[in-house]
Design a protein with these regions (language model features):
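Gly/Ser-centered flexible loop/linker motifs
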Residues: 132-134
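Short Lys/Arg-enriched alpha/beta "domain-start" segment
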Residues: 22-130, 153-158
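Eukaryotic regulatory low-complexity N-terminal regions enriched in Ser/Thr, Pro, acidic
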Residues: 136-187
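Polybasic, low-complexity terminal segments and linkers that are predominantly intrinsically disordered
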Residues: 1-30, 141, 174-191
Length: 191
């Protein structure tokens, strides 16, 4: 008997526990191939950006743009923070991660969906409280959803405070990354 695939939302509604939400990372392949030289140029330009610029957009969307080193450090701390929040029983948060890849299996962007659990039933709410879209080629993120304030207050702000204490290291990492990217793009142009 052949199993019919179910959508993630169907699995969430049928699931009695949140265990499946955090057990793996789903991969979705997009029908295009990322232009690697353009992506490398964007990354090199991202080294020259301000540490971070963030603002609210229309329809309760939160946008943040980073320089390259800050983005990579932010991503690392973001996953650590979300992991610790989801394992803390008092926060009642769970999450899913979708890696969106191109046809060469390069991760173009990641989508993290954060779900609140219903306190009485301990089941996930049917809709994500908020989604975090991490755009790797532009070193930026876009967050939207009804729980955007939770993201800003409990996730984004503490990570930002932590990163502000590492600005000297970020400058060094950024300079090293820019040099490596410059060498890489000049090597590619000579081929």
């Amino acid at each position: 008997m052949e199993m019919q695939p179910t959508r993630a939302s169907s699995r969430l509604r049928k699931n009695n526990s949140m265990d499946d939400l955090c057990t793996g990372i789903a991969t979705k392949c997009k029908p295009y191939t990322l232009d690697q030289s353009k992506a490398m140029n964007k990354k090199e330009k991202a080294c020259d950006k301000d540490y971070i610029t963030f603002y609210m957009k229309a329809n309760n969307n939160f946008r943040a743009e980073f320089n390259m080193a800050t983005y990579e450090l932010f991503k690392d701390k973001l996953f650590t923070t979300i992991d610790s929040m989801s394992s803390d029983q008092s926060t009642l948060l769970k999450y899913t991660v979708d890696n969106n890849t191109d046809q060469k299996n390069m991760v173009v962007f990641q989508t993290i969906k954060i779900y609140h659990m219903n306190k009485r039933s301990m089941l996930p709410n049917r809709r994500a409280s908020f989604s975090i879209n991490l755009y790797n080629s532009t070193s930026s993120l876009l967050t939207n959803g009804t729980g955007i304030n939770l993201f800003i207050d409990d996730i984004f702000s503490p990570i930002l405070k932590c990163l502000q204490q590492q600005l000297d290291c970020i400058d060094i990492i950024n300079a090293d990354m820019k040099c490596a990217l410059s060498n890489s793009t000049s090597d590619q142009s000579q081929v």
